[in-house]
Amino acid sequence: MAAAAASRGIGAKLGLREIRIHLCQRSPGSQGVRDFIEKRYVELKKANPDLPILIRECSDVQPKLWARYAFGQEKNVPLNNFSADQVTRALENVLKPEASTED
């Protein structure tokens, strides 16, 4: 799981500075992201207490995962119509070493 991967320090080795998740409070396209937050946010945060994990809700916004790395590099992944499991896999992908390139 992403929380376990991050707790092993993988994110730290990449220079991962912040994770942001943008979603809509009501849209069907953000349902999987809302499910992910309800089911997995606490575990993820407990495994990564020093990593800022920001949840940003905004009406009619397309759900998206942002990872900010050292030197201002960012990676983003659209999450529209993803299930909670797909959101988990997207998060795991941004924690991989090859993910730390600018998008």
From Swiss-Prot:
Q: Which residues carry this modification: N-acetylalanine?
A: 2
Q: Which UniProt keywords apply?
A: Acetylation, Disulfide bond, Electron transport, Membrane, Mitochondrion, Mitochondrion inner membrane, Respiratory chain, Transport
Query: Which cysteine pairs make disulfide bonds?
Result: 24-58
**CC terms in the record's Gene Ontology section:** mitochondrial inner membrane; respiratory chain complex I
Q: Which residues carry this modification: N6-acetyllysine?
A: 64, 75
How does the entry describe its membrane topology? Peripheral membrane protein
Q: Where is the signal peptide?
A: none
Locate the N6-succinyllysine modifications and list their residues: 64
Q: How does it assemble?
A: Complex I is composed of 45 different subunits.
Protein's UniProt name: NADH dehydrogenase [ubiquinone] 1 alpha subcomplex subunit 2
**Gene assigned in the entry:** NDUFA2
